[in-house]
Structure formats: C-alpha cells, structure tokens
Amino acid sequence: MLQEDKRELSESYFSKERLAEHHFRSYNAFLEHGMQDVVTEKERIETDIGDKEDEEPVWVELGDVRAVTPRVREADGSEELLYPQEARLRNITYSAPVFMEMSIVRGGEEEEERVLDTTETKVGRMPIMVGSDKCNISGFSDEELIEIGEDPADPGGYFIINGSERVLMTSEDLAPNKILAEYDSKYGDEIQVAKTFSQRRGYRALVLVERNREGLLEVSFPSVSGSISFVTLVRALGLESDEEIVHRVSEDPEIVKFMLENLEEADVQTQEEAIEDLGQRVASGQGKNYQLKRANYVIDRYLLPHLHEDGVEEEETRINKAYYLCRMAEACFELALGRREADDKDHYANKRLKVSGDLMKDLFRTALNKLARDVKYQLERANMRNRELTVNTVVRSDVLTERLEHPIATGNWVGGRSGVSQLVDRTDFMGVLSHLRRLRSPLSRSQPHFEARDLHATQWGRICPSETPEGPNCGLVKNFAQAMELSQDVDDERDLKQELSSMGVEGIPGISMETTSTTSADD
Amino acid sequence: MTRSTRQRERETAAKQEEEEDSEEGVRECPECGSDNLVKSSDRAELVCNDCGLVVEEEQIDPGPEWRAFNHQERQEKSRVGAPTTQTMHDKGLTTTIDWKDKDAYGRSISSKKRSQMHRLRKWQERIRTKDAGERNLQFALSEIDRMASALGVPRSVREVASVIYRRALKEDLIRGRSIEGVATSALYAACRKEGIPRSLEEISEVSRVERKEIGRTYRYISQELGLEMKPVDPKKYVPRFCSELELTEEVQSKANEIIETTAEEGLLSGKSPTGYAAAAIYAASLLCNEKKTQREVADVAQVTEVTIRNRYQEQIEAMGIHG
C-alpha cells in the first residue's frame, strides 16, 4: 500500500463521525426498531376487570411506537424545537416526546370484542443522544451549527439530562448463550462445570451443569433450589431412552462409560416420572396437579430461555433444550478427560459489549412495564367508578419519562448497577474523546482479579494496550483502540438461519422442520 | 460559580423560611419590636438588624453539604430528604417498608421474618390512609397529578391545585359533588391563578367528568373559597396557540399588539378570551403574510369559526385596518 493511501486510511479513522460511531449506531438501532421490539414483546396490557361475575374483560392493545425530535414544553403549554445548547444552558432535558398507538378493548367472553377507544397518545419523553438520527442537529453543516451555538467539533454521543451531559458507559459482559466449561472446587474437590448465561428479552438465567466427585451430572437453574440430576431433567424434556441420551451426549467410548454410570444412578425412567420428580422439587408439599403444572411452567419459563423462539412449538423447544444440555454435559466430560482446556473468560471471543442502545433498551423495557402497571391501575379505577374508558385519561406520561430520565441522571441503572451514566469529562477535548470511547468491566474493583486486569492477546487491535487508569480500576476500565470496529448483533435471526439452512445446516429449529425428520439435529 | 449557586440556594431557602415564618406571625424582635430580622446562615443565627439581638441560634441548615458541583452530588450531600409536598396526601412524609427482603447489611432474611415483614407491609399500606377523608384526598391528588401530567402542567401549579383541593375538602365543599369534578376544577383554578390558563375544553379532554360539571363545580368552589379569579388575559394563550400553529415570533408580537390596543377600547369585556386570542392570531397571521385558515386557528383554540369571524371583524375595525 502506498504511503499516501495509508495516511488517508488512518486519518479517516480519526474523523468526527468515527469517534462516537459505536454510540450512534447502537442508539439509532434502538430508536429504529429496539423500541418497537420492546413494545411488540409487551403486546398488551391485561387488567383485572372481568374477574367478577357479569363483567367483560378489558385490556389494552399496544401498537406502533415512535419518537419525534427533541422539544421543550414551556409552562404556558407551547411546545418548541429544542437544540442541545439551549438544553445545556437552561438546565433542561434534551428529550423527545414518544407516541404510542393504544386501543382499549372490552369483551371476548359473552359479548363480542369491542374497541372502546383507540388513539395515538403521548406516553412520555425519551432522552435523545446528541448527534443521533433523532437529534435536531443531525445533518447540520458547520455554519448552521455555529448559528445555533453548537460546537462543530463536538463529537456528540451523550445525553443531556437537566442540563448536564451524561455518557452511558459501555460495559463489557461475558457472552450470553454460550457454553463455557471450567474447573471449580466444591468441598475441596475439583469438579468440572459447564455454564451458560441464557438470555432472552432482558431475562437472564444462569444454567450450570456440574460433574460432581462421584462423576454424576447435576443441573441447576433459576427457580429450582439446589440442583437436579441431569438424567431426570433430560427425561423430563422428552429425551427418554438410555440409548438416545448417550448418543446425544457423545460417541466417545470413555464419555459413554461416564454416561452409563449416570444412567445407572437414575431414579426415573419415563418422561412422566421425571416431571413428577421435578414437581416435587419445585412445589413440594403442594397438590399433585399443581406440582405438575408448576414443573411444566418452570421448564418452559426458567430453563435455557434463549432457546425459545416465536413460531417454534413448545414441544420442539423442549427437545432442543435437552440437546443443549447434552452439549453442556459433553463439555463437562471432555474437560474431565483433558480433551479440552477450560474456556478462557478473558478471551475477547467470550465477551460482548453493551453500548448505549442496549442499555437504553433495558431501561425502556422496565419503564414500559411500569407504565403498563400504571395504566392497569388507572383503568381499573376508572372502571370501578363507572367512568368511560378512554386512552387519554388512563395514560400518565410522567411515569415513563421519570423512569427513563432518573437512571441516566443518577447512573443507577435497572438491575442495581450504578455508575452506568457519567458526567462527560470536559477537562479538555481529548478528555471527551477518551470518555466516549471508554468501557468498563462489571467486575468489582475491590477484588484482585489479576487475570481480568491483564492485557489479553485477543485485545490486539480492539483495546488500547496502554490507556487504563492507575490504581484500583487498573485494567478494568479500558479504552477502544482507534481502529476498533464494533460489530452489531444480528437484527433478524430468521434471515441468518435461512442462510445457514441454504448452506446445508440441518435441524435448525423453526426453519427446516419439514426437511429434516430423522437426521441428526446436532449443530 | 459554586459559591453563587450556594448563595442563591440559601437565599431562596431563607426566603421560603421567612414566608413560613410570616405565616406563623411570631417573627418580630422581642426586644425592640422590629420586624427587621435577618437570617445569617454563616452563623446559623436569626439576628435583629436594628438592635442586634440574637433571636435564635443553632438553626439547622437544610441545604446540601459544602461543595456540590452537580445534581447528583447535591443529592448525595444533602442532609435532609425531599421537601414536603402538598401533592401527596401525607405530604410525602410516609414511612414505607421496602419490598426487598433484605436486612441492613443486604443479607436475605429468614422466612419467618419475611412473612412478618409481609404482614407489616400489608398493614402499613392499609393504615397509611386512616379515614375516608384521607382516602378521598389520596384519590383526588392522584387524579390531579394524572391530569396535570397529561396537560404538561409544571410542578408548582400542581402544588397550588392540591392546596385548593385541600381547602375545598376542609370546608366540606366536596359533599354532593364528585371527587373527580372538584379535582378537575381545582386544577383549572390553579392554572388560571398561576397565569398559565388552560381552557375548559382542554381540561375536560383529560378529565373523567364532563365540561359542564367542571364549569359548575369550578364556579361553586371559587365562590366558596373566595379565589377571586380575574378574567383570563387573552395574551396568555397567544404563545401556545402560535407554537401549535407553527407561527413565528413576529405573528406573536403582532397578535399581542392587537389584543392590547383593542382591549383598551373595551372590546374584550364579556368575550371569551380564547376566542379573542384566536381572532387576534388570525388577524396577525394575515398581516404578517403567514396566513392560517380560520378553521386551523379554530381547531387549535377550540372555538368555532363563527366566533373567530365576529371577534376578527370587531378587532380590525377598532384597529382601523380593513382586511
């Protein structure tokens, strides 16, 4: 490559658009479909109206959601466009009204379903990132920016809440939905564990498969105290016969031997027995019917939630869960036999970054739930007093606004994390740039965590090897390398799966159900 | 900068306290009888400015700790909780039992303790509102908050609305009227009192009672409570209507000018202020070449086109313009 070409390339990495690009991309994606995804997930708000006799149930259907560009509402009720500089100077929030389509529906039991009211109503205000697509200054030329008092060199990428500029810290998390095998010790013995942080729609569940000192496999997952036998669980999921279980775990003769030990110790032989057994664990001392109901609910709700998918039947999901557990078991055995090394948690392939858009999505989800609870309450109250139910009289837009602004203003995020938002470092221009490109490890700074602080070979080209603070945060707070490229997750997994299927991958859930029936469903 | 904000805060705090003091009516120097008392926050004293007597010492400074640079620090360093507010039935002084089943160290508590906390929580929730009057207030205040939130009414006005409602409750004016009706009229009255009027139409859109009832209840409570409401100045409506119609500042000032000159000639008396403002805006938009149709203006102001036409005719005649 020619010298000039190299220079041009490296210069383009320092251009204004590149500096906070990861923030813009992530936040724009959130505005474009992240917000809608959350609303579509929620779908509707149910109420307790209709629980009584001769009363028709009422619920609210949620439709399209959209945010406009930032506006300020003056005390006299007039609304005007707001530019960042005005927000900074007047100590107000740079946020845009959010509108959502809502319709109140009554009926369904004896009467026909009837829409009582349907309107697009203002549900709250969303803080807007300076420089994002919805920002009022996006697309302005330098002259226009100077005209409205904005600094043309300012990189943007932060929010303005009550006049103070706040960046959302990118956080570095362990990759979800991935099997990580590692050694652990229990009562002085070394054991092998396969871990998966299963994540779907903001719900996160840790599933552990352990090989204890007797060589037996145990699984633990949320809502079940302690651990349950691996064989019982896969049988409950519909993988019944000994042969199939062994075959699904591995063909390796030594692992087969381990598996046979496990099968010998099994307390149950059929799916029914297994579910009964599970029921006794999750709802002991309750009635038999309730135990069964609860066991099924726990399996479908709390075990490996990331394997669920729209349009895939519960039955198929269950068997996929069983296969997935078999993969985890295999990882355990391989580790025990020394066929593989323990996974490196500091390897960058095992890390995912949560950028502003992902954080805002978490926030918006809880805020919307809060709003839904309030709407439910208002509806029930209005109904109790026999008032007409209209969308405008049941939505309190302050609820959502408050829930969105407060965490950004204080840094206390949902899920108990603190320090997520920070005041933009305006010491000098370099300070701002560095701050926008900073990332934080969620590990506690009071513990040593020597490996996590070390420079890892896989950080090459991604993380700056020298820019990290001295002292307790050393190695936990990092900065992006200048030429770092941050890839985003796939928006539409279906497309990806279709593509994979066309390349010959078999047994992808929900895609090739009709093509594969007897062939292996391994990945 | 910090210094100045601090001073400002102290000043406002001092002012507030003075106001509270004056309500109590005990603030005069016991020595010389002067009411020229000065609060010196540096020494935490209340001093008579005329004779120098220290009336009160070791006062508590409710302000935040020294040096707080931003909102968060101010909150962290503050030595007191949130101020009391009239918008909550208990003025925001409740004790709530946290839903987290954790002790002071953040450890989970035993199941026995947990069920005890559950019971305590339930009863705390039940006895928080001790009687029917209190329940009434709780319901009404949340209605006021709901409507104010939908209308985008600022905090201070909600406070005023709550005070009006509280007074109505105290004087037993609610009897025979619906809670929602009185709450809505209290909010309407508060908006007018604070100079950011909302029309009855706007209010009734977010209220759960009808316009007629709001008007009736409003007249009743404003009379009984002696609210002495002056007719609304049509100029108060101009900025809002103009921004909704996306008209420029120029039109706004022109409309204000029209209202001022014509009101001096007594055209306003007996006319609806919204209609009057709408007509002035319509006229101003014509004069400034930013024409809006009567229909558009009427929609925003929630009056009829006929009203606009009539007021418009009167106004341009008085202004001596012939449109």
From Swiss-Prot, chain A:
Residues 513-523 have a biased composition (Polar residues). GO terms for cellular component: cytoplasm; DNA-directed RNA polymerase complex. Its EC number is 2.7.7.6. InterPro entries: DNA-dir_RNA_pol_su2, RNA_pol_bsu_protrusion, RNA_pol_Rpb2_2, RNA_pol_Rpb2_2_sf, RNA_pol_Rpb2_3. It is found in: Cytoplasm. GO terms for molecular function: DNA binding; DNA-directed RNA polymerase activity; ribonucleoside binding. DNA-dependent RNA polymerase (RNAP) catalyzes the transcription of DNA into RNA using the four ribonucleoside triphosphates as substrates. The Rpo2 subunit (Rpo2N and Rpo2C in this organism) is implicated in DNA promoter recognition and in nucleotide binding. Part of the RNA polymerase complex. This is DNA-directed RNA polymerase subunit Rpo2N.
Curated annotation (Swiss-Prot), chain B:
A zinc finger (TFIIB-type) spans 24-56. SMART domains: CYCLIN. Signal peptide: none annotated. SUPFAM superfamilies: Cyclin-like, Zinc beta-ribbon. Residues 1-16 have a biased composition (Basic and acidic residues). Zn(2+) binds at C29, C32, C48, C51. GO terms for cellular component: transcription preinitiation complex. NCBIfam families: PRK00423.1. Belongs to the TFIIB family. PANTHER family: TRANSCRIPTION INITIATION FACTOR IIB, TRANSCRIPTION INITIATION FACTOR IIB-RELATED. This is Transcription initiation factor IIB 7. It comes from Halobacterium salinarum (strain ATCC 700922 / JCM 11081 / NRC-1) (Halobacterium halobium). The lineage of its organism: Archaea, Methanobacteriati, Methanobacteriota, Stenosarchaea group, Halobacteria.
